[in-house]
């Protein structure tokens, strides 16, 4: 357990806990928290995904997990979550409650690693640049994208306009975000009420978004239906990596960690924190499904639905089960998808096939290849830990019949990294949006067919038809950005130190 105090995001992540009936809820001695005895984990391990770090792994870790906010390293294991975006009206009062009432109940990585230490409400908090300014913290944090804010240059940085953005994300009025996570929404409601009561008029809620794990067999799958979060990197010094899992230095994710090359404030208050990129990404599921049916490749002996599923798998790079098409190109293998010892153990190379021309296994343009190119380009510095969650209702029968979205749904995307221009921003703009990436191939791959942006114009994607690997498909946008912001999730110690001073 290494790392010094500092750098926690304005994402106040509150993991609320398991169902009330399965936990004992008590009156909180701290007015900002919901307390009680937890009997089951507030997190969910899904078959096929890297597991939550165990207490044993955390105990022998070289990271200072007592000071790192839990959401940073927990990943995509939450069951219910609320993102509570706020503005600070009275900095002095806010600082008092931040240090006295919020900091003591912020959940660390250490706490979340064991049911016995998990709170009913696990609380994290993160701040935008305008939020730090409101608190009088004017240090150069070493990240120009964070300082400018996400809305400042979306056309140049992300290849999108703010036309579809939620109004609150278009202005710099969001000072921070509180994340509340649980499997019981009523506990989240209680926690939000407690926080609002504690801060009173010192803060105002600007916007909120609720997310939830999908029901039944879809648990762990995003709204298009694909198992999500398989390729999370492993942090050196924390646990044992799975076969094929990329191992990155702590400083790729944690500010001030090993091999974080950026100069930070000399007093070290940021060490142990991480930059949080939040994105509200609407997914047009009925339209996506209709596109797959309309453009299904011709494959002998397969039904239309099977061929549509094949196209979807080639766009993503995995079947819905999580099985990588690089290992099973023409048919899903659910057992492979559910096996973390096998489902990430590939690198796009195959004997007797050239990596510069072979798209029979996996297209160069596939989402998982564009965003983690493996043998195409080994780039551990361009890694993120994702900690998002689906939001919105399941597709209704009426929407499916009309092939049109009427109720918004999608992904509340969260990534953590020590540098936004090497993490989220790099993956989105330099890789996913860039039609020339992956470089050095015999064809130009086109944009990432899932998240790639093209400034609102039609996208051209190559290699999706296994029988015509140089052919292109044209497509609109199935993932529509509704906005977001960049935050800093500070170390827990900074909440009673630098940020409360």
From Swiss-Prot:
Residues 22-60 form a propeptide. Thermostable. Retains 50%-90% of its activity after heating for 2 hours at 60 degrees Celsius, while no decrease in activity is observed within the same time at 30 or 40 degrees Celsius. The keyword Membrane does not apply. It catalyses: Reactive Blue 5 + 2 H2O2 = 2,2'-disulfonyl azobenzene + 3-[(4-amino-6-chloro-1,3,5-triazin-2-yl)amino]benzenesulfonate + phthalate + 2 H2O + 2 H(+); 2 a phenolic donor + H2O2 = 2 a phenolic radical donor + 2 H2O. Optimum pH is 4.5 with 2,6-dimethoxyphenol as substrate. Retains more than 50% of its activity after 4 hours at pH 2.5. One of its GO terms (molecular function) is metal ion binding. GO terms for cellular component: cytosol; extracellular region. Pfam families: DyP_N, Dyp_perox_C. Heme binds at residue 367. It is an enzyme of class 1 (oxidoreductase). Binds 1 heme b (iron(II)-protoporphyrin IX) group non-covalently. This is Dye-decolorizing peroxidase.
